[in-house]
């Protein structure tokens, strides 16, 4: 039996999603709990591997098991075993040809900036604090230049191992809700650090260090060194993964926290 799980996690105390030797990872915690539920070793495959400090409200994984278990064992049962900063949001039997990574048609991220002169005392693990005022109108104006199919070499990590930098951004927007500035981005797939590098550039535009059209110039340059510094991990969330309807993967509230669901 193949099962898909929806996973939510606060990545602050983890060295990323992927299991690694001698460090704490989200994958390790989920696999350990699943192995106890199934009474055999379980390996999971995720939709997208997030970096150290990055969070998830819409991560999707799959695993195989022959253990006769009701789905409630993989939701309520798992949540009794997992640490409080990881939770299962749904469990769903799926077809054998479903693959959490390769069946995905799009991923969606949100980046949350607490834009206030003074730092806050709550939620500080889940947002990036930035004390200079950001012009979200200019940031939103810049978004148009990245929507579409382009070579995103200027926005990939130097050590990114992807074979091609061609990606298609389907949606990119910037909104302000009080002291919070939210960047919402959806693409067929992302390069390593792509969202955080785009965020860093948008923040410089929000500071009026660059004009919105600068993003188009960066696309044409195809040179990472010409772009802004990578934004911090703390404000980034994987909030949704799209799959073909045939797999019937449940949709859960995007979040994080107070942010409304917006169909795009």
Curated annotation (Swiss-Prot):
Q: One Pfam family, please name it.
A: PseudoU_synth_1
Show the InterPro entries listed in the entry.
PsdUridine_synth_cat_dom_sf, PsdUridine_synth_TruA, PsdUridine_synth_TruA_a/b_dom, PsdUridine_synth_TruA_C, TruA/RsuA/RluB/E/F_N
Family under the similarity heading: Belongs to the tRNA pseudouridine synthase TruA family.
The EC number(s) this enzyme carries: 5.4.99.12
According to the UniProt entry, its GO molecular function terms are: RNA binding; tRNA pseudouridine(38-40) synthase activity
An example Gene Ontology biological process = tRNA pseudouridine synthesis
> What's the protein called, per UniProt?
tRNA pseudouridine synthase A
Q: What class of enzyme is it?
A: isomerase
Tell me how this protein assembles.
Homodimer.
The record's listing under PANTHER family reads:
PSEUDOURIDYLATE SYNTHASE, TRNA PSEUDOURIDINE SYNTHASE-LIKE 1
Keywords, in A-Z order:
Isomerase, tRNA processing
Q: Function of this protein? A: Formation of pseudouridine at positions 38, 39 and 40 in the anticodon stem and loop of transfer RNAs.
Name of the gene this protein is made from: truA
* Domain of life the protein comes from: Bacteria
Q: Which residues bind substrate?
A: 109
Identify the CDD domains for this entry.
PseudoU_synth_EcTruA (cd02570)
Q: Does the keyword tRNA processing apply?
A: yes
Residues annotated as catalytic: 51
Catalytic reactions of this protein: uridine(38/39/40) in tRNA = pseudouridine(38/39/40) in tRNA
